[in-house]
Amino acid sequence: MLKKERQAYIIQQINIHNKVLSSDLSTQLNVSEDTVRRDLQELSEEGKLIKVHGGALSKSFHFTIQNENIYLLPEKKIIAHKAISLIKDGMFVLLSGGTTIRELVKSLPPKLNATFITVSVPTALELLNHPNSEIIFLGNKLSKNAQMAVGAEVVQRLNEIKADLCFLGTNSFDANEGVTDLEWDVIEVKKAMIRAAHKTVSLSISEKLNTVQRLLVCKPEEIDILITELEPDNETLQAYRDKGITVL
């Protein structure tokens, strides 16, 4: 595979999943990790991604970077507007992080009066712009890559919460394997969020469906509702409906 083709693949993967590991790319591309690191360094110098230890992050995922080029933004807006229909006045709502969650928060009706609990720094900052909702940030140790609070204290606080809904930003979701991700600390927090909620809603662009990462967040049966940009009767979603998941 030519360098141009490798780098195009890397950009595609980072756009879909927001973050990539050098070791995974090495396996997928059948090249050495040194080659992958050189590609990531070059793409970083071109301003196309953020190189971090062990991999890279999407620039649109990193809220400190001023970048309006969010991948598949129209599709994420569709997902956000579908999700808003589930939120009612008086609800306690858990929010993870990610660009789709941020679009959800940006689209909240100004008159909505709900309590939002989040572990995500960008999500909390976006919620500050909402006039009528209470914000609870569960802070502790921060994951620089995910820009969210992680650790035993956060998990313990989540264990004491009984929320109506949990909106989960999704890295990968396969109808057989479930929701998967890359970072252990982040996964432990997401598991606690799912346990803390009466219903869990996965927000996912369709490109993240039928993909699998290294670490399990939850089995498919633990997701109550899946929201994508697709029409609910799209055949791509049939496998998820077969698992008893409500598809919006």
Segments from the language model and where they lie:
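Short, charged low-complexity intrinsically disordered segments located at boundaries
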Residues: 39-44, 71, 114-116, 155-156, ...
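Aromatic-residue hotspot detector
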Residues: 28-29, 167
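HTH-adjacent hinge/linker in prokaryotic transcriptional regulators
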Residues: 2-9, 15-23, 27-28, 34-99, ...
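Conserved phosphate- and dinucleotide-binding cores of soluble alpha/beta proteins
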Residues: 2-5, 12, 22-23, 125-248
